[in-house]
Swiss-Prot record:
Keywords attached to this entry: Cell cycle, Cell division, GTP-binding, Magnesium, Metal-binding, Nucleotide-binding, Septation
NCBIfam families reported in the protein's UniProt record: GTPase_YsxC (TIGR03598)
The encoding gene: engB
Pfam families the UniProt entry points to: MMR_HSR1
PROSITE patterns (UniProt xref): G_ENGB
Species annotation: Wolinella succinogenes (strain ATCC 29543 / DSM 1740 / CCUG 13145 / JCM 31913 / LMG 7466 / NCTC 11488 / FDC 602W) (Vibrio succinogenes)
Family: Belongs to the TRAFAC class TrmE-Era-EngA-EngB-Septin-like GTPase superfamily. EngB GTPase family.
Role: Necessary for normal cell division and for the maintenance of normal septation.
Name of protein: Probable GTP-binding protein EngB
Binding site for GTP: 31-38, 58-62, 83-86, 153-156, 175-177
UniProt cross-references to InterPro entries, sorted A to Z: G_ENGB_dom (IPR030393), GTP-bd (IPR006073), GTP-bd_ribosome_bio_YsxC (IPR019987), P-loop_NTPase (IPR027417)
PANTHER family tied to this protein: ENGB-TYPE G DOMAIN-CONTAINING PROTEIN (PTHR11649:SF13), MSS1/TRME-RELATED GTP-BINDING PROTEIN (PTHR11649)
Transmembrane segments: none
Record-annotated EngB-type G domain positions: 23-197
Length: 200
């Protein structure tokens, strides 16, 4: 069983130059505004208020760092979780979205301590072009020592037939209803396995 036994807010950064010096392996959470990044992070670390959601989606431009200790058996594994700004919010200007995109790509390319990208996708809207573009972008810039996984959120909003279809379509993805321990446990297991470079 994998648990997160310690978690705390580390720092926020609005530019690559403000990010903390690399110390531990990092897991980056990326996705559209309102997809549930903060909620998923809080569920993973079992803390309701660690990652804060903005009251105005798409407003926050900060890269937020969280320091965590994961436990598997007697092994304690330090990881940093990185919550990136949400993208694609309609009320943000095109110029601002472009600027954010360029900053994020630069960040993802230059941050050598990133070991895993976690892209969150709303299960109700699995075919949005902006999500496909983000997936392709990550695939284009990731290094050989990095991995990337999809996590479909809000699965509880689908009927069982649509849930099954989505799971069959993306057999390597993780699925969570943003509720319930089973889905979150599977995400924890996958995250740790991929960060450590372990086989399935």
């Amino acid at each position: 069983m994998i648990t997160v036994v310690e978690s705390s807010f580390l720092t926020s950064a609005s530019a690559l130059s403000q990010t903390p010096p690399p110390k531990n392996s990092e897991v980056v959470f990326i996705g559209r505004s309102n997809v549930g990044k903060s909620t998923l992070i809080n569920l993973i670390v079992d803390s309701k208020g660690l990652a804060k959601s903005s009251s105005t989606p798409g407003k926050t431009q900060l890269i937020n760092y969280f320091e965590t200790i994961w436990k598997r058996g007697e092994e304690r594994i330090p990881l940093w979780l990185v919550d990136l700004p949400g993208f694609g919010y309609a009320k943000v200007s095109k110029e601002m979205r472009k600027d954010w995109g360029e900053k994020l790509i630069h960040f993802l390319q230059e941050r050598r301590s990133i070991k895993l990208f976690v892209q969150l996708i709303d299960a109700r809207h699995p075919d949005l072009a902006i999500d496909a573009e983000a997936w392709a972008m990550i695939g284009a810039i990731k290094r050989g020592d990095q991995k990337v996984i999809r996590v479909f959120t809000k699965m509880d909003k689908l009927n069982r037939n649509d849930q099954k279809k989505l799971q069959q379509r993306y057999p390597d993805a993780c699925f969570t209803a943003m509720l319930g321990k089973e889905g979150i446990a599977s995400v924890r297991e996958r995250v740790l396995k991929d960060v450590l470079g372990e086989e399935a």
